[in-house]
């Protein structure tokens, strides 16, 4: 289906803050619900059938320093499936050290928007391993932990980063992130239509119908956090929805 995934994937999120797994509402600090040890969570998702894990260092996203590096290292050592990581990856050296350490794909957000040449540089050195994260609120790309609006259209940005060599786009709809209120597929569809590389959809997934919609819309995968941690459905059920087509 894509160069990143053999078929549509439902990817569990392991978002880390202060050493715990957390889920935030619309990315806002102070809204977090905590779900315990990241390594335990990662192992549980592997046992549940995950084919990829999505790790986010939220302290890195907010502060710019990778505060959960120890947990990331432990997860890499503990699981035998591909791991993609975002949050606080600001420089080529940051990305290279993670890729060399065993992270399969790094996700560049703020750093990519502020310095697109970084994407091109890394994509040349690590082809197929650089994902650009585009987070949008009110139809505009936001950066710095979703706190600053750029005025950039996410579909336009996605096309530009595809040209720069990104192997995929992680698109997060901040307007619905963490609210368990369902997705806004039209926004995601615009990004999918703008590029020929895989788009991983994130934000607002609350039901199996949401997953089916994203699959039908053309997403290569979806990252799911709150809905899985709150037992709205199981990972097995979510994966089965897309395998039954």
UniProtKB/Swiss-Prot annotation:
Alphabetical UniProt keywords: Amino-acid biosynthesis, Cytoplasm, Histidine biosynthesis, Isomerase
Q: Which reaction does it catalyse?
A: 1-(5-phospho-beta-D-ribosyl)-5-[(5-phospho-beta-D-ribosylamino)methylideneamino]imidazole-4-carboxamide = 5-[(5-phospho-1-deoxy-D-ribulos-1-ylimino)methylamino]-1-(5-phospho-beta-D-ribosyl)imidazole-4-carboxamide
* Protein name stated in the entry: 1-(5-phosphoribosyl)-5-[(5-phosphoribosylamino)methylideneamino] imidazole-4-carboxamide isomerase
Q: Quick one: where is this thing mainly located?
A: cytoplasm
> Where found in the cell?
Cytoplasm
**Keyword Phosphoprotein belongs to the record:** no
| GO process annotations (BP) | L-histidine biosynthetic process; L-tryptophan biosynthetic process
What cystine linkages occur within this chain?
A: none
